């Protein structure tokens, strides 16, 4: 009987040693064009044929489920031979880790796209865009959960995935957003990293508890929790 748990060993959420995890030690940042004070992260998404195989597996997992997808199916979807699949991955379990890595990259990338596009000094508008990006990363326009939720729940790794997703998103926000904020605002809280974790975990739970909660209400929760300075900043030089 097909199962996402190979030989009784559950798929773990964390990357294999071949693909280092997002940690402060190995995150690679770059300066955002047009800004002297803003950083963003370099993408860690798999590319080339390995990325093509991971994307094929992801599409099949979301369409037919993990248990019903075979390596043969993945090879056919990717348009490659099974031999090539095994050249890049030891088996289905490692492919599944790559799919989970890709989901994590989606979430981190969503935060970084928001960060790169926000307008300096307009904290309220930036916060609204942040809340909207948060919703889009987990739910579609109709309020339905993204397909990745079904996949991680089938794998039985929802809690571990949530922990990793929050940690890596907060790593990114701490390195690229909090650092810039601190240059131009007084930081009114201690344990900034931990408070970011509280906010993201709290928002995920709050939206599940009350799907009808508005963006304005979520903004107020974030503003009050982080004690954000919402006054606009006017700066003569480009940042």
What are these regions (language model features)?
Residues 1-48, 234-239:
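N-terminal intrinsically disordered/low-complexity leader segments
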Residues 52, 56, 60-94, 98:
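Helix-turn-helix
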Residues 28, 66, 89, 151-159:
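Short helix-capping/turn signature of helix-turn-helix
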């Amino acid at each position: 009987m097909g199962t996402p748990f190979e030989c009784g060993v559950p798929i773990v959420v964390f990357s294999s040693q071949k693909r280092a995890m997002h940690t402060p030690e190995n995150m690679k940042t770059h300066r955002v064009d047009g800004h002297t004070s803003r950083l963003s992260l370099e993408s860690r998404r798999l590319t080339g044929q390995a990325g093509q195989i991971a994307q094929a597996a992801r599409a099949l997992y979301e369409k037919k489920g993990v248990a019903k997808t075979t390596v043969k199916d993945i090879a056919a979807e990717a348009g490659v031979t099974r031999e090539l699949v095994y050249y890049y991955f030891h088996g289905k379990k490692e492919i599944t880790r790559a799919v989970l890595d890709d989901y994590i990259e989606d979430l981190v990338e969503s935060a970084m796209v928001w960060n790169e596009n926000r307008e300096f000094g307009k904290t309220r508008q930036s916060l609204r865009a942040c809340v909207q990006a948060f919703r889009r990363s987990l739910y579609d326009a109709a309020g339905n959960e993204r397909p990745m939720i079904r996949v991680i729940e089938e794998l039985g790794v929802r809690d571990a995935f949530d922990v990793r997703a929050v940690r890596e998103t907060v790593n990114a926000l701490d390195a690229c957003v909090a650092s810039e904020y601190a240059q131009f605002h007084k930081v009114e809280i201690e344990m900034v990293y931990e408070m970011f974790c509280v906010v993201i975990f709290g928002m995920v739970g709050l939206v599940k508890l009350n799907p009808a909660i508005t963006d304005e209400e979520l903004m107020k929760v974030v503003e009050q929790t982080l004690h954000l300075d919402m006054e606009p900043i006017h700066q003569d030089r480009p940042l």
